[in-house]
């Protein structure tokens, strides 16, 4: 819940000097990316911008405090300020900020700019007190903001120092409007106007000019002089002389003498107590100060000119001028030290009553009240956890004594989930074990079950499925039906364990159950996770179309709940890329893989390993070995600089071994084979993939017997576990083994099985990747004309893809080849004396590649009758009577030229 006063522009006060000369300069602010107002405290930055903002509608205002260094809090308020300016135009960003569903501030801002692209009016965003930001991540994000913000948006930043926002670059490009302390300083005329408004007896222009010069036009000094002159008999000039040369860091003595010592004791205590509040309203003031009518008291303080300012148009929220507020807080620690804990407790209670637990925690921490802090956490911690207030929770839990956590195991569980969310798996188990050792009877009942659910999640994340299964089952046995979150966690873990064990049907049912529970209780990240798992299972079972439809449901969930920036989004677009690759939709597969990299742009480069492997796979399927090599260099660098799950390593190894196969790099394959992991089992698609990598390397090295043993065992496991996609892949690799070993009938047998199974999986690129050896076999099958209709159609499609991407279309019959052929000593005399035209050579190449007459006409973009003429002519020149004879003749020519066909 956001504090309204932080998003309210300060109300323009009566008796303030209208800074006409500065307002004139600000009138052109819409021509700049950034309007920067910088000066020490008390020069009137906020007052000036509130005057400028008066009457503007398309403006958002965000007043910072120290707590805004937390990235999530900064994002929530900044987006809320934009929503304020645009009347709710950026709904997607607002939801993402509220639910913390973004990868980083920069990615959230990128989405913001997409939404703002449809906002065409001038737009202003004011950020006040930016000097309070010390978080370098926020600085970097705001530099990104300024670089990419729409042309119609102007950012207005108020700061006591020069912020780290790339100011020099903006200045060079004339995109910066600057107002500094010299310009903010009051002129003689403005000082005269100021005193005329504040003092009952006007002073001479010469006198006010001297006073203005004495304090160098510092607005706060002028205000203090006017206050002092009203409260006692000191002349304004005497006060000015005392303030001359003084600056904000040396005001304490003056403020004590001239302000605090000149108010009654009740007002003094009111000022000191209320100053602990960063913002205040009637209820807060009444509770903290003990005075009955807080609103009336605030208005009275405002009338006295005691540096209090309204924060909203309703007049409900107030705050002290930062300079005066800091002074009062320091004095409060001196003068009311004994009462201060109780004052903070009162503030915490009032904030809680108004529904702001994070503000209440701030005061409970300041009070050092562990019991109050414990009670707030017991009631609100999980809500704060779900809103990613992780830093605040961690600070709060550290402030509680261990005994307090033991008395409230829910807080131990919370601390453990915090560790889990930060991938500190070892610390989770250590914490829970310590708690179980010291808490009586914890090993029974609901809390123990919740511990086990979390432990199960840690175990599966840490690659220990057996332990995860044991713990998840224990949790589900002990958890009451109403403990939905832990039940969702345990059910999801159990489904993932069964997936790892190859029990796909049972795993699918549990993941569907997880999805149903997660949707029912709005636990959207587990709903998304379960859909991704369902898609992977369906893919493994060979039901790629159903996997596609499940992915569509996941994309819809992401759009509805604005989950685009969760890391899981990358998982989804990656498995979509795998599916598109299987169907030979390579451009779309590449685009999906690149979008996955974009989702992870704010994370460590190692996280991009799987998407990078997918990009390499696309290059290999296209036969683009140069691009694949360039990408492989990066992939191998990432592999050497990170620790990865075995599934990730298997996928990375897959493209490496494929590349070595396509380039004939036996040395690299042999070296890899000596060092790579040899899994104990092959009962899921992760392990099947690694063993397939091993078999492919063995085939490249001519170790056919070893590879056959591996592949036959893989097929046995795949058939028993119904891993149909893996079976399809295994059959294709077995086909290559038989083909290279000269076992042509076995090769044809398993190729027919693979084509038949592909009617279910839809595989195309898995055939294409095997290149010319696959093309030769498919040509023979097509020419035999014995394939069933579906397999015939698929074989032709695969052949077209191979010809397109692996350059077998004209590669053997281009002009250079024909010239060399005609000069070959063994070339048939018929070809030498009656040579084919270049077009006829192209047609012969396409006939050899398995193209029909219609397909050749389409490829060469000529009429079918023209193709028939070319074919008739080349048959006559070659001395052949039919298509099969032409193919055989072309094959002889290729062998003569040294091509292994």
UniProtKB/Swiss-Prot annotation:
Q: Please give the CDD domains that the UniProt record associates with this protein.
A: LuxR_C_like
Pfam families with a match to the protein in the record: GerE (PF00196), TPR_MalT (PF17874)
- Specify the DNA-binding region ranges: 853-872
Modulation of this protein's activity: Activated by ATP and maltotriose, which are both required for DNA binding.
The positions annotated for binding ATP are: 39-46
Q: Does the keyword Oxidoreductase apply?
A: no
The HTH luxR-type domain extends over: 829-894
Q: Which GO terms describe its molecular function?
A: ATP binding; DNA binding; DNA-binding transcription factor activity
- Per its UniProt record, what PROSITE patterns does this chain match? HTH_LUXR_1, HTH_LUXR_2
Matches recorded under InterPro entries? P-loop_NTPase, Sig_transdc_resp-reg_C-effctor, TPR-like_helical_dom_sf, TPR_MalT, Tscrpt_reg_HTH_MalT, Tscrpt_reg_LuxR_C, WH-like_DNA-bd_sf
* Protein's GO biological process: positive regulation of carbohydrate metabolic process; positive regulation of DNA-templated transcription
Domain of life per record: Bacteria
Q: Name the UniProt key words of this record, in alphabetical order.
A: Activator, ATP-binding, Carbohydrate metabolism, DNA-binding, Nucleotide-binding, Transcription, Transcription regulation
What interactions and quaternary structure are annotated?
A: Monomer in solution. Oligomerizes to an active state in the presence of the positive effectors ATP and maltotriose.
Q: What does this protein's UniProt record list under function? A: Positively regulates the transcription of the maltose regulon whose gene products are responsible for uptake and catabolism of malto-oligosaccharides. Specifically binds to the promoter region of its target genes, recognizing a short DNA motif called the MalT box.
Q: Give the family this protein belongs to, as stated in its UniProt record.
A: Belongs to the MalT family.
Supply the PANTHER family for this chain: DNA-BINDING TRANSCRIPTIONAL ACTIVATOR DEVR_DOSR
UniProt name for this protein = HTH-type transcriptional regulator MalT
Q: What is the protein's species of origin?
A: Escherichia coli O6:H1 (strain CFT073 / ATCC 700928 / UPEC)
Gene name per UniProt? malT
């Amino acid at each position: 819940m956001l504090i309204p006063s932080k998003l309210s522009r300060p109300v323009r006060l009566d008796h303030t000097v209208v800074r006409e000369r500065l307002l004139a300069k600000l009138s052109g602010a819409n021509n700049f990316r950034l309007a920067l107002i910088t000066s020490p405290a008390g020069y009137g930055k906020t007052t000036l911008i509130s005057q400028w903002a008066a009457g503007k509608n398309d403006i958002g205002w965000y007043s910072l405090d120290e707590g805004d260094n937390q990235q999530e809090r900064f994002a929530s308020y900044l987006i809320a300020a934009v929503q304020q300016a645009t009347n709710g135009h950026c709904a997607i960003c607002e939801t993402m900020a509220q639910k913390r569903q973004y990868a980083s501030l920069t990615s959230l801002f990128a989405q913001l700019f997409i939404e703002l692209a449809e906002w065409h009016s001038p737009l202003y965003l004011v950020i006040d007190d930016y000097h309070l930001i010390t978080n370098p991540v926020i600085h970097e994000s705001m530099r990104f903001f300024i670089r990419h913000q729409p042309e119609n948006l102007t950012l207005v930043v108020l700061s006591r120092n020069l912020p780290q926002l790339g100011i020099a670059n903006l200045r060079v490009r004339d995109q910066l409007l600057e107002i500094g302390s010299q310009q903010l300083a009051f002129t003689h005329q403005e000082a005269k106007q100021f005193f005329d408004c504040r003092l009952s007896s006007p002073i001479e222009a010469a006198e006010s000019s001297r006073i203005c010069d004495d304090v160098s036009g510092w607005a706060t000094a002028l205000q203090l002089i006017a206050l002092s002159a009203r409260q006692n008999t000191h002349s304004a000039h005497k006060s000015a002389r005392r303030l001359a040369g003084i600056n904000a860091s040396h005001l304490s003595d003056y403020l004590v003498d001239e302000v605090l010592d000149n108010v009654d004791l009740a007002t003094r205590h009111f000022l000191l107590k209320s100053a602990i509040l960063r913002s205040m309203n009637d209820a807060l003031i009444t509770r903290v100060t003990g005075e009955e009518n807080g609103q009336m008291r605030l208005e009275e303080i405002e009338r006295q000119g005691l540096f209090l300012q309204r924060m909203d148009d309703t007049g409900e929220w107030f705050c002290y001028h930062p300079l005066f507020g800091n002074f009062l807080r320091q004095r409060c620690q001196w003068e009311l030290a004994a009462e201060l804990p109780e004052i903070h407790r009162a503030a915490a209670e009032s904030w809680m009553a108004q529904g702001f637990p994070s503000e209440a925690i701030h005061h409970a921490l300041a009070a050092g009240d562990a019991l109050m802090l414990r009670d707030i956490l017991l009631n609100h911690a999980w809500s704060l956890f779900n809103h990613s207030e992780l830093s605040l929770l961690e600070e709060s839990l550290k402030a509680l004594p261990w005994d307090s956590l033991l008395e409230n195991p829910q807080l131990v569980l919370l601390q453990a989930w915090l560790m889990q969310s930060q991938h500190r798996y070892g610390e989770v188990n250590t914490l829970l074990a310590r708690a179980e050792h010291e808490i009586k009877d914890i090993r029974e009942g609901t809390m123990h079950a919740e511990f086990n659910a979390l432990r199960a999640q840690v175990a599966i994340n840490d690659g220990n499925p057996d332990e995860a299964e044991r713990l998840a089952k224990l949790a589900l046995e002990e958890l009451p039906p109403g403990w939905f979150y832990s039940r969702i966690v345990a059910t999801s873990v159990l489904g993932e364990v069964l997936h790892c064990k190859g029990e796909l049907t049972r795993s699918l049912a549990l993941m569907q159950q997880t999805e149903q529970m997660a949707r029912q209780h709005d636990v959207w990240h587990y709903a998304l996770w379960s859909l991704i798992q369902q898609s992977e299972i369906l893919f493994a079972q060979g039901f790629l179309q159903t996997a596609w439809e499940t992915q569509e449901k996941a994309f819809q969930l992401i759009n509805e709940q604005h989950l685009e920036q969760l890391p899981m989004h990358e998982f989804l677009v990656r498995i979509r890329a795998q599916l598109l690759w299987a169907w030979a939709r390579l451009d779309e597969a590449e685009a999906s893989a690149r979008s996955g990299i974009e989702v992870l742009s704010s994370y460590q480069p190692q996280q991009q390993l799987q998407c990078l492997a997918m990009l390499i796979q696309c290059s290999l399927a296209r036969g683009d070995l140069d691009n694949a090599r360039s990408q492989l260099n990066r992939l191998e660098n990432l592999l050497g600089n990170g620790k990865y799950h075995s599934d990730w390593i298997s996928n990375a190894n897959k493209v490496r071994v494929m590349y070595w196969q396509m380039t004939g790099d036996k040395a690299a394959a042999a070296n890899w084979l000596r060092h790579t992991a040899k899994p104990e089992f092959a009962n899921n698609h992760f392990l099947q993939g690694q063993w397939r990598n091993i078999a492919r390397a063995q085939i490249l090295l001519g170790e056919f017997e070893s590879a056959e043993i591996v592949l036959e065992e893989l097929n046995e496991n795949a058939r028993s576990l119904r891993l149909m996609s893996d079976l399809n892949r295994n059959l294709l690799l077995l086909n290559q083994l038989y083909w290279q070993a000269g076992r042509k009938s076995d090769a044809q047998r398993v190729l027919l099985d693979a084509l038949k199974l592909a009617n279910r999986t839809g595989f195309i690129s898995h055939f294409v990747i095997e290149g010319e050896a696959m093309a030769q076999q498919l040509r023979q099958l097509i020419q035999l004309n014995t394939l069933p209709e579906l397999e015939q159609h698929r074989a032709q499609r695969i052949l077209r893809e191979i010809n397109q991407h692996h350059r077998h279309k004209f590669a053997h019959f281009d002009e250079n080849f024909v010239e060399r052929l005609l000069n070959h000593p063994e070339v048939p005399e018929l070809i030498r004396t009656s040579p084919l035209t270049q077009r006829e050579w192209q047609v012969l190449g396409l006939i050899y590649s398995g193209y029909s007459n219609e397909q050749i006409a389409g490829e060469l973009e000529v009429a079918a009758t023209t193709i028939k003429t070319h074919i008739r002519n080349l048959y006559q020149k070659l001395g052949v009577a039919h298509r099969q004879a032409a193919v055989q003749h072309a094959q002889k020519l290729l062998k003569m030229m040294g091509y292994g066909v």
